[in-house]
Amino acid sequence: MNFDLPGTGTDQSPVFLNAADCRAWLARMPLANATQAQPMISRQINLLHRFALPPTERFAILESLRGPLSEVQDAAARQFAGKPLPLAPDEQAALDGTLGVWHLLALGYLRCFAALCVADDGRAPAPALLAQRTLSVFADWQVDLCRGQQLPDASYWKKLNQVFSAAETLGISGSAVGDPVRHGNLPTSALAAYAECTLLTTANLYELPARHLAWVARWARRWGAKLALLKAPPEDIRSRAVPLWVDLESDRPASYVPQSTTSGLWLDTTELRKSLLARVVLLEQGRAPAELQLGDDVTQPAAGQLLQRVLQRWCKGGTPRRHERHSASGGCGLIAGFEAVHFQLSGRRPFHAPSRDTATLRREREQFEVFGVRRQSVPDIMKQADSPVEAWQVADDWHLLNESATGLRITRPFVHGGRVGAGLLIAVRMPGSLHFTLGSLRWALRESSESLAAGIQLFPGEARPVAVRIVESGDARGPWLQGFLLPGIAALDEPASVIVPAGTFRIDRGIEAMVDQQMQAFKLLRVLDHGLEFERCSI
């Protein structure tokens, strides 16, 4: 069994050579300070990985490190999780350090697994435990890759598939083992850890905000044990989930599209589907997420929405595209951020809350009818002249990769341009167009050291920048805020909508909008789209 591991020697040893010394060393470490502790631990794991030790002793040391190390890694991840790309230098350093530690820990368990599998006949518990530990580190590694808006590369999937293939060959992939660090008192297995990695990749974690990513990662860990391994696909899937297919000899993750190969296996998610559907129903009946073992920090309605999302991706064959996507090319301009988009679509004029009374508005309309222009007061002109946003250079240059009627995939050099992240309101100007189209940045990924890619959902219709405010009970009104109106499009079955700041929506909430110096009133009916900073609501 060859995992392409570097050789070992005795030239430079870590500060501990047995589990007891390792625990004593950890007791002296500043584990509460991830910035200090992580590089110190990383150096010792690197030395341990290259130092010759009996595999049983190496395994005992890794087990002593694993619990405290997981807490340090969780603390370090808070520095980069959910942050826009490119990361700031301190955020990038935290990400690099975190991924480096997971890589070294995975290699350490791999070394133990390879050595003990050769020496053992497969009937002892050691190989089953080692396979589960190795695969579980790969799962933690994948979660932090997605938190840093990266995807596992081919070498990751090759090693993951190799380990699980070896566990299958030894007949221990489904053997129950304990893992107090990740599963408490519940039993787990190598198959459950491998299934967890599969659930993580099919969930497209990088599209989620940091809080929701943590929920789905927790669910994948908890429910990986519900997946079953099949040698052949089910003959009749009418009452079953759509199985995932994986080639254990490949360097690719599982998918719903089987290929012609002799090393393919299927992962059946039928039991998981039953569990998800039951939870969705109970949430709709008013049960609390914590009662359904979704987590004490999980809230509604986000819990139900996320369960529906993973149900589609884990059990129903993935999410089909509404419109066919095809290759495209050309440069496009992108503006990211609610305020910047409003500024650009307003003719690069800064936002000022409407403050004139009804009589003033009537007089200005009369002036417009007579003179053809709206006269501005001296304070209005002075406010615009003093506004710093007029100097904004808010449009970044991107390159179009593919497109559909409702979406785009674009790319740009990684370090050039502003920071972008999932959930931002954006405006994009397509090749050959003079106008911007409004949309949402669905995801952003660092594809290499030099490339940043992003996926965009386009909103139909020509957006109109307006001022909006909430109508409270009685005569109370909220402050004027930036917003956008989008027309209804009957051919696309798209209702008229308004884009408001996140947190505005309530069913039947009254909204007023100032449009061309005229007040319009309407009610919010339902949320059509939402992001970190906006909600698009039908009216």
Please annotate each region the language model reported.
Residues 3, 16, 51, 59, ...:
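Phenylalanine-focused residue identity feature
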Residues 83, 158-159, 226, 231, ...:
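Context-gated lysine
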Residues 177-360:
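Extended, domain-scale alpha-helical bundle/helix-rich regions
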